[in-house]
Amino acid sequence: MKFVTASYNVGYPAYGAKFLNNDTLLVAGGGGEGNNGIPNKLTVLRVDPTKDTEKEQFHILSEFALEDNDDSPTAIDASKGIILVGCNENSTKITQGKGNKHLRKFKYDKVNDQLEFLTSVDFDASTNADDYTKLVYISREGTVAAIASSKVPAIMRIIDPSDLTEKFEIETRGEVKDLHFSTDGKVVAYITGSSLEVISTVTGSCIARKTDFDKNWSLSKINFIADDTVLIAASLKKGKGIVLTKISIKSGNTSVLRSKQVTNRFKGITSMDVDMKGELAVLASNDNSIALVKLKDLSMSKIFKQAHSFAITEVTISPDSTYVASVSAANTIHIIKLPLNYANYTSMKQKISKFFTNFILIVLLSYILQFSYKHNLHSMLFNYAKDNFLTKRDTISSPYVVDEDLHQTTLFGNHGTKTSVPSVDSIKVHGVHETSSVNGTEVLCTESNIINTGGAEFEITNATFREIDDA
Protein backbone atom coordinates (compact mmCIF):
# COMPACT_ATOMS: atom_id res chain seq x y z
CA MET A 1 0.00 0.00 0.00
CA LYS A 2 1.53 3.27 -1.16
CA PHE A 3 1.15 6.75 0.30
CA VAL A 4 2.27 9.77 -1.72
CA THR A 5 3.31 12.89 0.22
CA ALA A 6 4.50 16.39 -0.60
CA SER A 7 5.30 19.58 1.34
CA TYR A 8 5.19 23.25 0.45
CA ASN A 9 6.27 26.53 2.05
CA VAL A 10 3.32 28.90 1.79
CA GLY A 11 5.33 31.90 3.03
CA TYR A 12 3.50 32.64 6.29
CA PRO A 13 2.53 30.81 9.50
CA ALA A 14 -0.62 28.84 8.66
CA TYR A 15 -3.31 28.59 11.33
CA GLY A 16 -6.27 27.17 9.42
CA ALA A 17 -7.03 24.89 6.48
CA LYS A 18 -10.13 23.50 4.77
CA PHE A 19 -10.80 21.66 1.52
CA LEU A 20 -13.22 23.60 -0.68
CA ASN A 21 -13.66 20.57 -2.94
CA ASN A 22 -11.84 17.30 -3.61
CA ASP A 23 -8.52 18.88 -4.65
CA THR A 24 -8.83 22.57 -3.74
CA LEU A 25 -7.39 23.63 -0.39
CA LEU A 26 -7.96 26.90 1.46
CA VAL A 27 -5.18 28.01 3.85
CA ALA A 28 -5.22 31.02 6.19
CA GLY A 29 -2.58 32.61 8.39
CA GLY A 30 -0.02 35.35 8.62
CA GLY A 31 2.41 37.25 10.76
CA GLY A 32 -0.26 39.12 12.69
CA GLU A 33 -0.19 42.72 13.84
CA GLY A 34 3.21 44.27 13.22
CA ASN A 35 4.05 41.33 11.04
CA ASN A 36 7.54 42.51 10.04
CA GLY A 37 6.94 41.80 6.39
CA ILE A 38 5.03 38.55 6.90
CA PRO A 39 1.58 39.01 5.30
CA ASN A 40 -1.83 38.02 6.62
CA LYS A 41 -3.45 35.99 3.85
CA LEU A 42 -6.00 33.56 2.56
CA THR A 43 -4.60 31.26 -0.13
CA VAL A 44 -6.43 28.81 -2.39
CA LEU A 45 -4.36 26.01 -3.92
CA ARG A 46 -5.02 23.02 -6.16
CA VAL A 47 -3.07 20.11 -4.68
CA ASP A 48 -1.79 16.86 -6.17
CA PRO A 49 1.32 15.31 -4.61
CA THR A 50 1.67 12.83 -7.47
CA LYS A 51 2.77 15.57 -9.88
CA ASP A 52 6.43 15.97 -10.79
CA THR A 53 7.13 19.57 -9.80
CA GLU A 54 6.31 21.59 -6.70
CA LYS A 55 4.41 24.13 -8.78
CA GLU A 56 2.16 21.38 -10.09
CA GLN A 57 1.82 19.76 -6.68
CA PHE A 58 0.74 23.07 -5.10
CA HIS A 59 -0.78 25.31 -7.74
CA ILE A 60 -1.91 28.66 -6.30
CA LEU A 61 -5.30 29.61 -7.70
CA SER A 62 -6.12 32.71 -5.67
CA GLU A 63 -4.89 34.82 -2.74
CA PHE A 64 -6.52 37.49 -0.63
CA ALA A 65 -4.35 39.80 1.48
CA LEU A 66 -5.73 41.02 4.81
CA GLU A 67 -4.80 44.27 6.54
CA ASP A 68 -1.19 44.31 7.71
CA ASN A 69 -2.14 46.01 10.98
CA ASP A 70 -4.77 43.43 11.83
CA ASP A 71 -4.18 40.19 13.67
CA SER A 72 -3.62 36.97 11.75
CA PRO A 73 -6.59 34.65 11.11
CA THR A 74 -7.15 32.30 14.04
CA ALA A 75 -9.91 30.01 12.75
CA ILE A 76 -11.61 29.23 9.44
CA ASP A 77 -14.29 26.98 7.99
CA ALA A 78 -16.02 26.70 4.63
CA SER A 79 -19.08 25.06 3.12
CA LYS A 80 -20.89 25.43 -0.21
CA GLY A 81 -18.55 28.22 -1.31
CA ILE A 82 -19.07 30.30 1.86
CA ILE A 83 -15.99 30.95 4.03
CA LEU A 84 -16.01 32.27 7.60
CA VAL A 85 -12.78 33.57 9.12
CA GLY A 86 -12.10 34.52 12.72
CA CYS A 87 -9.66 37.43 12.65
CA ASN A 88 -9.28 40.39 15.03
CA GLU A 89 -8.74 43.93 13.85
CA ASN A 90 -5.79 45.89 15.22
CA SER A 91 -5.40 46.08 18.99
CA THR A 92 -5.45 49.88 19.20
CA LYS A 93 -8.89 50.07 17.66
CA ILE A 94 -10.15 47.36 20.00
CA THR A 95 -8.83 48.90 23.23
CA GLN A 96 -10.21 52.31 22.24
CA GLY A 97 -13.67 50.78 22.03
CA LYS A 98 -14.03 51.42 18.32
CA GLY A 99 -15.20 47.90 17.61
CA ASN A 100 -13.66 44.69 16.36
CA LYS A 101 -15.27 43.00 13.40
CA HIS A 102 -13.73 39.68 14.33
CA LEU A 103 -15.84 37.43 12.07
CA ARG A 104 -15.42 37.89 8.32
CA LYS A 105 -17.32 36.31 5.46
CA PHE A 106 -15.86 35.46 2.05
CA LYS A 107 -17.15 33.73 -1.05
CA TYR A 108 -15.19 31.39 -3.28
CA ASP A 109 -16.08 31.51 -6.97
CA LYS A 110 -15.08 28.07 -8.24
CA VAL A 111 -15.62 29.09 -11.86
CA ASN A 112 -13.06 31.89 -11.75
CA ASP A 113 -11.12 30.50 -8.76
CA GLN A 114 -11.42 33.82 -6.94
CA LEU A 115 -11.93 34.84 -3.32
CA GLU A 116 -14.32 37.70 -2.63
CA PHE A 117 -14.80 39.52 0.67
CA LEU A 118 -18.49 40.01 1.51
CA THR A 119 -18.94 41.40 5.03
CA SER A 120 -17.76 41.31 8.66
CA VAL A 121 -19.41 41.63 12.06
CA ASP A 122 -18.61 42.27 15.73
CA PHE A 123 -20.52 39.95 18.04
CA ASP A 124 -18.45 40.31 21.21
CA ALA A 125 -18.14 44.10 21.55
CA SER A 126 -14.99 43.49 23.59
CA THR A 127 -12.37 46.08 24.46
CA ASN A 128 -9.81 43.43 25.38
CA ALA A 129 -7.43 42.81 22.48
CA ASP A 130 -6.57 39.39 23.92
CA ASP A 131 -10.10 38.12 23.27
CA TYR A 132 -10.37 36.43 19.89
CA THR A 133 -12.50 33.98 17.92
CA LYS A 134 -11.08 30.60 18.86
CA LEU A 135 -13.39 28.30 16.89
CA VAL A 136 -15.44 28.65 13.71
CA TYR A 137 -17.58 25.85 12.25
CA ILE A 138 -20.19 25.65 9.50
CA SER A 139 -22.60 22.75 9.06
CA ARG A 140 -22.04 20.46 6.08
CA GLU A 141 -24.93 21.97 4.12
CA GLY A 142 -23.97 25.53 5.07
CA THR A 143 -27.29 26.27 6.79
CA VAL A 144 -25.97 27.09 10.26
CA ALA A 145 -22.67 28.10 11.84
CA ALA A 146 -21.17 28.37 15.31
CA ILE A 147 -18.34 30.38 16.81
CA ALA A 148 -16.70 30.26 20.23
CA SER A 149 -14.62 32.92 21.91
CA SER A 150 -11.35 32.49 23.76
CA LYS A 151 -12.90 33.80 26.98
CA VAL A 152 -13.24 31.55 30.01
CA PRO A 153 -16.03 30.70 30.44
CA ALA A 154 -16.43 30.91 26.68
CA ILE A 155 -19.36 32.43 24.85
CA MET A 156 -20.68 30.29 22.02
CA ARG A 157 -22.97 31.68 19.35
CA ILE A 158 -25.18 29.90 16.83
CA ILE A 159 -25.43 32.09 13.74
CA ASP A 160 -26.98 32.14 10.29
CA PRO A 161 -24.09 32.15 7.78
CA SER A 162 -26.24 33.67 5.05
CA ASP A 163 -26.46 37.06 6.78
CA LEU A 164 -24.27 36.63 9.90
CA THR A 165 -27.16 37.15 12.31
CA GLU A 166 -27.15 35.51 15.73
CA LYS A 167 -29.76 32.82 16.49
CA PHE A 168 -28.69 31.82 20.00
CA GLU A 169 -26.03 32.71 22.53
CA ILE A 170 -24.82 29.88 24.76
CA GLU A 171 -23.04 30.45 28.05
CA THR A 172 -20.68 27.54 28.51
CA ARG A 173 -19.29 25.95 31.67
CA GLY A 174 -15.64 26.74 31.00
CA GLU A 175 -13.12 26.82 28.19
CA VAL A 176 -14.55 25.35 25.00
CA LYS A 177 -11.97 22.96 23.63
CA ASP A 178 -13.78 22.09 20.41
CA LEU A 179 -17.21 21.95 18.77
CA HIS A 180 -18.83 20.29 15.78
CA PHE A 181 -22.16 19.95 13.95
CA SER A 182 -24.14 16.83 13.23
CA THR A 183 -24.30 15.98 9.53
CA ASP A 184 -27.82 17.40 9.23
CA GLY A 185 -26.91 20.57 11.14
CA LYS A 186 -29.73 20.16 13.67
CA VAL A 187 -27.39 19.57 16.59
CA VAL A 188 -24.11 21.08 17.73
CA ALA A 189 -21.88 19.47 20.35
CA TYR A 190 -19.06 21.07 22.28
CA ILE A 191 -16.58 19.86 24.86
CA THR A 192 -14.71 21.38 27.75
CA GLY A 193 -11.77 19.57 29.29
CA SER A 194 -14.11 17.26 31.21
CA SER A 195 -17.64 17.50 29.80
CA LEU A 196 -19.77 17.08 26.69
CA GLU A 197 -22.81 19.21 25.94
CA VAL A 198 -25.20 18.75 23.01
CA ILE A 199 -27.37 21.68 21.88
CA SER A 200 -30.30 21.81 19.47
CA THR A 201 -29.69 24.43 16.77
CA VAL A 202 -33.46 24.64 16.29
CA THR A 203 -34.47 25.53 19.86
CA GLY A 204 -31.15 26.43 21.47
CA SER A 205 -31.85 24.05 24.35
CA CYS A 206 -29.54 21.40 25.78
CA ILE A 207 -30.61 17.92 24.71
CA ALA A 208 -27.79 15.82 26.18
CA ARG A 209 -24.93 16.18 28.63
CA LYS A 210 -22.14 13.97 29.93
CA THR A 211 -19.82 14.91 32.78
CA ASP A 212 -18.67 11.54 34.13
CA PHE A 213 -15.62 11.00 31.95
CA ASP A 214 -12.52 9.27 33.25
CA LYS A 215 -10.73 11.63 35.65
CA ASN A 216 -7.43 10.91 33.89
CA TRP A 217 -8.77 12.14 30.56
CA SER A 218 -8.39 15.66 29.23
CA LEU A 219 -10.89 16.08 26.40
CA SER A 220 -9.52 18.01 23.45
CA LYS A 221 -11.30 17.31 20.11
CA ILE A 222 -14.77 16.26 18.96
CA ASN A 223 -16.36 15.29 15.65
CA PHE A 224 -19.68 13.79 14.62
CA ILE A 225 -19.34 10.44 12.85
CA ALA A 226 -23.14 10.04 12.50
CA ASP A 227 -26.15 12.17 13.37
CA ASP A 228 -26.43 10.49 16.77
CA THR A 229 -22.80 9.55 17.45
CA VAL A 230 -19.76 11.66 18.32
CA LEU A 231 -16.07 10.81 18.41
CA ILE A 232 -14.06 12.46 21.19
CA ALA A 233 -10.29 12.50 21.47
CA ALA A 234 -8.67 12.86 24.88
CA SER A 235 -5.12 12.90 26.16
CA LEU A 236 -4.04 11.28 29.40
CA LYS A 237 -3.23 13.61 32.27
CA LYS A 238 -0.80 11.09 33.74
CA GLY A 239 1.67 9.76 31.22
CA LYS A 240 1.56 9.63 27.45
CA GLY A 241 -1.42 8.37 25.52
CA ILE A 242 -4.38 9.30 23.33
CA VAL A 243 -7.84 7.87 23.90
CA LEU A 244 -10.67 7.84 21.38
CA THR A 245 -14.23 7.25 22.54
CA LYS A 246 -17.44 6.84 20.56
CA ILE A 247 -20.51 8.19 22.35
CA SER A 248 -24.15 7.79 21.35
CA ILE A 249 -26.43 10.76 22.00
CA LYS A 250 -29.57 9.06 20.72
CA SER A 251 -32.87 10.20 22.27
CA GLY A 252 -31.10 12.66 24.54
CA ASN A 253 -29.19 9.96 26.43
CA THR A 254 -25.43 9.58 26.32
CA SER A 255 -23.89 6.12 26.28
CA VAL A 256 -20.33 5.04 25.55
CA LEU A 257 -20.23 2.71 22.55
CA ARG A 258 -16.50 2.07 22.63
CA SER A 259 -13.32 3.55 24.08
CA LYS A 260 -9.74 2.71 23.27
CA GLN A 261 -6.26 4.06 23.88
CA VAL A 262 -5.03 4.19 20.31
CA THR A 263 -1.41 5.10 21.06
CA ASN A 264 0.99 5.80 23.91
CA ARG A 265 3.45 7.73 21.73
CA PHE A 266 1.78 11.13 21.96
CA LYS A 267 1.28 13.44 24.89
CA GLY A 268 -1.50 15.40 23.20
CA ILE A 269 -3.17 16.24 19.92
CA THR A 270 -3.51 19.66 18.30
CA SER A 271 -6.13 18.92 15.64
CA MET A 272 -8.51 16.20 14.44
CA ASP A 273 -10.70 15.63 11.41
CA VAL A 274 -12.98 12.77 10.29
CA ASP A 275 -13.89 11.85 6.72
CA MET A 276 -17.47 12.34 5.52
CA LYS A 277 -18.28 8.63 5.81
CA GLY A 278 -17.21 8.53 9.46
CA GLU A 279 -14.69 5.77 8.74
CA LEU A 280 -11.30 7.45 9.11
CA ALA A 281 -9.90 9.96 11.60
CA VAL A 282 -6.70 11.94 11.22
CA LEU A 283 -4.90 13.28 14.28
CA ALA A 284 -2.14 15.86 14.60
CA SER A 285 0.11 15.20 17.57
CA ASN A 286 2.11 17.47 19.83
CA ASP A 287 5.34 16.06 18.33
CA ASN A 288 4.32 17.28 14.83
CA SER A 289 3.31 13.85 13.55
CA ILE A 290 0.18 12.82 11.63
CA ALA A 291 -1.73 9.68 12.63
CA LEU A 292 -4.46 7.82 10.74
CA VAL A 293 -7.05 5.87 12.75
CA LYS A 294 -9.62 3.46 11.30
CA LEU A 295 -12.84 4.04 13.19
CA LYS A 296 -14.49 0.65 12.67
CA ASP A 297 -12.21 -0.78 15.37
CA LEU A 298 -10.37 2.36 16.58
CA SER A 299 -7.07 0.99 15.30
CA MET A 300 -4.00 3.09 14.62
CA SER A 301 -3.16 2.30 11.00
CA LYS A 302 -0.37 4.72 10.06
CA ILE A 303 1.85 7.39 11.62
CA PHE A 304 3.76 9.97 9.59
CA LYS A 305 6.52 11.10 11.93
CA GLN A 306 7.64 14.72 11.98
CA ALA A 307 5.46 15.81 9.07
CA HIS A 308 6.29 19.40 10.03
CA SER A 309 9.20 21.03 11.82
CA PHE A 310 6.97 23.08 14.12
CA ALA A 311 3.49 22.91 15.66
CA ILE A 312 0.70 21.54 13.46
CA THR A 313 -2.24 23.91 13.71
CA GLU A 314 -4.88 22.05 11.67
CA VAL A 315 -5.56 18.87 9.71
CA THR A 316 -8.34 18.35 7.17
CA ILE A 317 -9.56 15.54 4.90
CA SER A 318 -10.85 16.11 1.37
CA PRO A 319 -14.56 15.34 0.77
CA ASP A 320 -13.73 12.22 -1.27
CA SER A 321 -11.18 10.99 1.31
CA THR A 322 -8.34 11.18 -1.23
CA TYR A 323 -6.14 13.74 0.53
CA VAL A 324 -5.13 14.63 4.06
CA ALA A 325 -3.76 18.14 4.44
CA SER A 326 -1.99 19.62 7.45
CA VAL A 327 -0.67 23.11 8.04
CA SER A 328 1.85 24.46 10.50
CA ALA A 329 3.14 27.58 12.15
CA ALA A 330 6.39 26.66 10.38
CA ASN A 331 4.85 28.12 7.15
CA THR A 332 4.36 24.65 5.67
CA ILE A 333 1.58 22.65 4.04
CA HIS A 334 1.85 18.86 4.00
CA ILE A 335 -0.30 16.70 1.71
CA ILE A 336 -0.83 12.94 1.94
CA LYS A 337 -2.57 11.05 -0.85
CA LEU A 338 -4.37 8.06 0.62
CA PRO A 339 -4.73 4.71 -1.16
CA LEU A 340 -8.16 4.05 -2.64
CA ASN A 341 -10.76 3.01 -0.04
CA TYR A 342 -8.06 3.15 2.61
CA ALA A 343 -10.44 3.14 5.60
CA ASN A 344 -11.70 -0.33 4.64
CA TYR A 345 -8.44 -1.72 3.33
CA THR A 346 -6.95 -4.76 5.05
CA SER A 347 -3.18 -5.08 4.77
CA MET A 348 -1.41 -8.35 3.99
CA LYS A 349 -0.04 -8.38 7.53
CA GLN A 350 -3.56 -8.05 8.94
CA LYS A 351 -4.86 -10.77 6.60
CA ILE A 352 -2.08 -13.17 7.67
CA SER A 353 -2.68 -12.37 11.33
CA LYS A 354 -6.42 -12.96 10.94
CA PHE A 355 -5.78 -16.23 9.07
CA PHE A 356 -3.52 -17.62 11.79
CA THR A 357 -5.91 -16.49 14.52
CA ASN A 358 -8.81 -18.28 12.83
CA PHE A 359 -6.63 -21.34 12.18
CA ILE A 360 -5.64 -21.59 15.84
CA LEU A 361 -9.28 -21.25 16.93
CA ILE A 362 -10.35 -24.01 14.53
CA VAL A 363 -7.57 -26.34 15.73
CA LEU A 364 -8.47 -25.63 19.35
CA LEU A 365 -12.16 -26.27 18.71
CA SER A 366 -11.36 -29.53 16.89
CA TYR A 367 -9.20 -30.71 19.80
CA ILE A 368 -11.97 -29.94 22.30
CA LEU A 369 -14.53 -31.85 20.24
CA GLN A 370 -12.19 -34.83 19.80
CA PHE A 371 -11.36 -34.91 23.51
CA SER A 372 -15.06 -34.70 24.36
CA TYR A 373 -15.94 -37.60 22.07
CA LYS A 374 -13.05 -39.77 23.32
CA HIS A 375 -14.05 -39.38 26.96
CA ASN A 376 -17.78 -39.41 26.32
CA LEU A 377 -18.10 -35.91 27.75
CA HIS A 378 -20.98 -35.04 25.47
CA SER A 379 -23.13 -37.85 26.93
CA MET A 380 -22.16 -36.90 30.46
CA LEU A 381 -23.06 -33.31 29.79
CA PHE A 382 -26.41 -34.30 28.30
CA ASN A 383 -27.27 -36.54 31.25
CA TYR A 384 -26.25 -33.84 33.70
CA ALA A 385 -28.44 -31.31 31.92
CA LYS A 386 -31.30 -33.80 31.79
CA ASP A 387 -31.08 -34.62 35.50
CA ASN A 388 -30.58 -31.09 36.73
CA PHE A 389 -32.53 -28.96 34.34
CA LEU A 390 -34.98 -30.83 32.16
CA THR A 391 -36.52 -32.86 35.01
CA LYS A 392 -36.86 -29.79 37.20
CA ARG A 393 -38.49 -27.91 34.39
CA ASP A 394 -41.09 -30.66 33.95
CA THR A 395 -41.99 -30.68 37.65
CA ILE A 396 -42.37 -26.96 38.10
CA SER A 397 -45.74 -26.30 39.73
CA SER A 398 -48.39 -24.66 37.58
CA PRO A 399 -52.10 -23.90 37.95
CA TYR A 400 -52.83 -27.44 36.78
CA VAL A 401 -51.23 -30.84 37.05
CA VAL A 402 -49.26 -32.36 34.15
CA ASP A 403 -51.36 -32.59 31.00
CA GLU A 404 -53.04 -29.52 32.38
CA ASP A 405 -55.76 -31.44 34.22
CA LEU A 406 -55.85 -34.12 36.88
CA HIS A 407 -58.23 -36.72 35.49
CA GLN A 408 -60.43 -38.82 37.83
CA THR A 409 -62.43 -41.71 36.44
CA THR A 410 -65.63 -42.69 38.25
CA LEU A 411 -67.38 -45.86 37.23
CA PHE A 412 -71.14 -46.10 37.08
CA GLY A 413 -72.10 -49.68 36.50
CA ASN A 414 -70.66 -50.91 33.26
CA HIS A 415 -69.95 -47.44 31.94
CA GLY A 416 -67.38 -44.90 32.84
CA THR A 417 -67.11 -41.12 32.64
CA LYS A 418 -64.10 -38.88 33.14
CA THR A 419 -64.16 -35.68 35.15
CA SER A 420 -61.41 -33.14 35.78
CA VAL A 421 -60.35 -31.90 39.19
CA PRO A 422 -58.11 -28.85 39.48
CA SER A 423 -54.84 -29.55 41.28
CA VAL A 424 -54.62 -28.49 44.92
CA ASP A 425 -52.65 -29.91 47.77
CA SER A 426 -55.60 -32.04 48.96
CA ILE A 427 -59.34 -32.21 48.59
CA LYS A 428 -61.27 -33.79 51.43
CA VAL A 429 -64.96 -34.57 51.44
CA HIS A 430 -66.68 -35.92 54.58
CA GLY A 431 -70.12 -37.26 55.28
CA VAL A 432 -71.50 -37.12 51.80
CA HIS A 433 -74.45 -39.50 51.37
CA GLU A 434 -76.17 -39.32 48.07
CA THR A 435 -78.04 -41.98 46.21
CA SER A 436 -78.77 -41.79 42.54
CA SER A 437 -79.87 -44.15 39.84
CA VAL A 438 -78.11 -44.54 36.56
CA ASN A 439 -79.36 -47.17 34.15
CA GLY A 440 -80.82 -49.14 36.95
CA THR A 441 -77.78 -48.88 39.19
CA GLU A 442 -77.93 -47.05 42.47
CA VAL A 443 -74.74 -45.30 43.42
CA LEU A 444 -73.88 -44.39 46.97
CA CYS A 445 -71.12 -41.74 47.01
CA THR A 446 -68.20 -42.09 49.34
CA GLU A 447 -68.29 -41.65 53.07
CA SER A 448 -64.88 -40.14 52.98
CA ASN A 449 -63.05 -39.13 49.82
CA ILE A 450 -59.49 -37.93 50.05
CA ILE A 451 -57.71 -36.81 46.91
CA ASN A 452 -54.07 -35.98 47.43
CA THR A 453 -53.30 -34.12 44.24
CA GLY A 454 -49.80 -33.12 45.29
CA GLY A 455 -48.66 -36.66 44.60
CA ALA A 456 -51.46 -37.46 42.16
CA GLU A 457 -52.83 -40.06 44.61
CA PHE A 458 -56.49 -40.90 45.20
CA GLU A 459 -58.16 -42.64 48.15
CA ILE A 460 -61.80 -43.61 47.77
CA THR A 461 -63.40 -45.24 50.78
CA ASN A 462 -66.82 -46.70 51.60
CA ALA A 463 -67.93 -46.76 47.99
CA THR A 464 -71.03 -48.94 47.70
CA PHE A 465 -72.80 -50.08 44.55
CA ARG A 466 -76.21 -51.77 44.84
CA GLU A 467 -78.23 -53.32 42.11
CA ILE A 468 -81.74 -51.95 41.92
CA ASP A 469 -84.47 -54.19 40.66
CA ASP A 470 -86.41 -52.92 37.75
CA ALA A 471 -89.88 -52.47 38.97
From Swiss-Prot:
The chain crosses the membrane at residues 355-373. Disulfide bonds: none annotated. It is found in: Endoplasmic reticulum membrane; Golgi apparatus, cis-Golgi network membrane. Keywords: Endoplasmic reticulum, ER-Golgi transport, Glycoprotein, Golgi apparatus, GTPase activation, Membrane, Protein transport, Repeat, Signal-anchor, Transmembrane, Transmembrane helix, Transport, WD repeat. Glycans are attached at N439, N462. Pfam families: WD40 (PF00400). It is a single-pass type II membrane protein. Residues 374-471 are lumenal. One of its GO terms (biological process) is regulation of COPII vesicle coating. Its main location: endoplasmic reticulum. SMART domains: WD40. Residues 1-354 are cytoplasmic. GO terms for molecular function: GTPase activator activity; guanyl-nucleotide exchange factor activity. InterPro entries: Sec12-like, WD40/YVTN_repeat-like_dom_sf, WD40_rpt. GO terms for cellular component: endoplasmic reticulum; endoplasmic reticulum membrane; Golgi apparatus. WD repeats lie at residues 259-300, 302-341. Belongs to the WD repeat SEC12 family. In the process of transport, SEC12 itself may migrate to the Golgi apparatus and function in subsequent transport events. This is Guanine nucleotide-exchange factor SEC12. It comes from Saccharomyces cerevisiae (strain ATCC 204508 / S288c).
